[in-house]
Structures are given as structure tokens and as C-alpha cells.
């Protein structure tokens, strides 16, 4: 009989063998919630992020055996650090079945011409270069492991579709992530590597709580927007991850029903 795990009321088919996932940005927000969801579904999970204490807090929140969670403090903008992260993953668990490229940053709302070079580079390095470096290492590991293959899920954001006012760095990098997702999906086919993207609307995380208080709209007004619980995002990622490798959710958008997305921009 197949085994099932229950996460926020949804049943997910447990893998026939213990699968290994790596989540970036696992110390808070979406990354933390997804990492806990994967642990609850029976995965062994490598938790990557800049802050050691935050990663340890995530592990402490897990209801499963702490032996299934490996926190690895990592700066994903540093290729050498990313190589070390994937090396530790292979040494600890022997393989990698799922990479969730989640880590991302933004900057305060700013007129396009006022964005500094340092701000631009920080967003580009974290939101685009970091996922690319992680994808490279995931490819290398997934290609050589037995059985070959795995799945990569990129966190694209609603901003991969349409911008908010005064958000050029974040919007540009999230559009670029869509290109990375498509290229990864194409280049991974022959190695049984699937790649999809989840584009998330406003979720109730520390990074996005200001949205509930009011943010600039395309018409120049400032209005609050609805948020969804991060557990809804975790459920969506778990569904994408639960598919066999011969099936793939290429793009999924999840957001509050009343979020001003259609018609925005």
C-alpha cells in the first residue's frame, strides 16, 4: 500500500525511497515553510541560508526527526560556497532529488534613476546569479547519481509577469528567472531533470507584511492588498514535487483571489 503524508490537510504520496531536497532561503518566510512541509512529507532536507541561527530555528520547528534536516549556512552568491553546499548534501545524503531555488531579496521602492549600482548588483547576484550557481551544481549531481535525474523548482514571483511601480531590479531579475527556468527545463530533458517555476503572490511573510498596510499601485494610489498564508505555497510546492519525473508543472501561479494581479501594470 502506498504511504501518505498529511500537510495542512492535504495528502501527499510518500516517495518509494527517502528523497532528498535542498531549499535555499530556508531560514524564514516561504523557504522555512516549504522546508518544514518537505520534512513533514518524509524528505531529508538540506536547509541553506545566510543566518545560522535562523536555520537552526527552522530545524527546531520540525516535527520529524532532526536527523532528516541538515542546516548549511551558505552565501548563494559565492560559487565556491555553493559548491561546498552541494558537496555537503552529497556527503550527507548521497543524492539530490529536489532543489527549491527560493532565496531572494529586494530593495526599498525607488525611482529607477535613483537605484544605486550596489543595490542593483545585490539584487541581481541574489535573485539570478545565486539560483544559476545552485542550478549548475544540481545539474552536476543529478546527472551523475543513480537513478539519474531530479527536479528543480524556481521561485519566480508575480513580478516575473508584471511589475510594481519603482521595482526595476526585483522585476528584472524575476523576469530573468523565467528565462532560467525555461532553459533549465529544456537542457535537463535528456538527463531526466525536470524544472518548473512557482510564481507567488503576496504571502504573509516578514518580507511582505508591509503590503497589507498599503503599497503603491500602477494608478499612483497607495492601497493595501490581501495576502495568503505561506502554508498554501508549501502545499503547491509539495504538489509540484510529488509528480513523477515524466510529468512537470512548468509554471504555477498562486495568490490571493482578490489580489490586484489581472489588470496590474
Regions found by a protein language model. Name each.
Residues 135, 173:
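Active-site helix of classical SDR
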Residues 41-57:
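Conserved glycine-rich Rossmann-like NAD(P)H-binding loop of the short-chain dehydrogenase/reductase
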Residues 157:
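Residue(s) in the substrate-gating loop at a strand-loop-helix junction
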Residues 197-198, 216-262:
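C-terminal helical subdomain
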Residues 73-85, 117:
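The beta1-alpha1 cofactor-binding region of Rossmann-like NAD(H)/NADP(H)-dependent oxidoreductases
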Residues 27-29:
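Conserved glycine-rich cofactor-binding loop
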Residues 110-112, 119-121:
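Substrate-binding pocket helix/loop in short-chain dehydrogenase/reductase
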Amino acid at each position: 500500500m502506498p504511504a501518505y503524508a498529511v500537510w495542512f490537510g492535504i495528502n501527499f504520496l510518500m516517495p518509494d525511497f527517502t528523497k532528498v531536497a535542498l531549499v535555499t532561503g530556508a531560514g524564514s518566510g516561504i523557504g522555512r515553510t516549504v522546508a518544514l512541509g518537505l520534512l513533514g512529507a518524509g524528505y531529508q532536507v538540506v536547509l541553506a541560508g545566510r543566518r545560522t541561527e535562523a536555520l537552526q530555528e527552522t530545524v527546531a520547528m520540525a516535527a520529524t526527526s532532526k536527523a532528516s534536516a541538515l542546516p548549511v549556512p551558505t552565501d548563494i552568491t559565492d560559487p565556491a560556497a555553493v559548491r561546498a553546499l552541494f558537496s555537503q548534501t552529497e556527503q550527507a545524503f548521497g543524492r539530490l532529488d529536489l532543489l527549491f531555488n527560493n532565496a531572494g531579496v529586494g530593495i526599498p521602492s525607488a525611482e529607477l534613476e535613483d537605484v544605486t549600482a550596489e543595490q542593483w548588483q545585490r539584487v541581481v547576484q541574489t535573485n539570478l546569479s545565486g539560483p544559476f550557481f545552485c542550478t549548475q551544481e544540481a545539474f552536476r549531481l543529478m546527472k551523475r547519481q543513480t537513478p539519474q535525474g531530479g527536479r528543480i523548482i524556481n521561485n519566480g514571483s508575480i513580478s516575473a509577469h508584471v511589475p510594481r511601480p519603482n521595482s526595476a531590479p526585483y522585476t528584472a531579475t524575476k523576469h530573468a528567472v523565467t528565462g532560467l527556468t525555461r532553459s533549465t527545463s529544456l537542457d535537463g530533458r535528456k538527463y531526466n531533470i525536470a524544472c518548473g517555476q512557482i510564481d507567488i503572490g503576496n504571502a504573509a511573510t516578514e518580507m511582505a507584511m508591509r503590503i497589507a498596510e498599503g503599497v503603491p499601485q500602477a494608478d499612483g494610489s497607495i492601497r493595501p492588498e490581501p495576502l495568503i498564508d505561506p502554508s498554501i505555497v508549501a502545499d503547491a510546492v509539495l504538489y509540484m514535487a510529488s509528480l513523477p519525473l515524466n510529468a512537470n508543472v512548468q509554471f504555477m501561479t498562486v495568490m490571493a483571489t482578490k489580489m490586484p494581479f489581472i489588470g496590474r501594470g
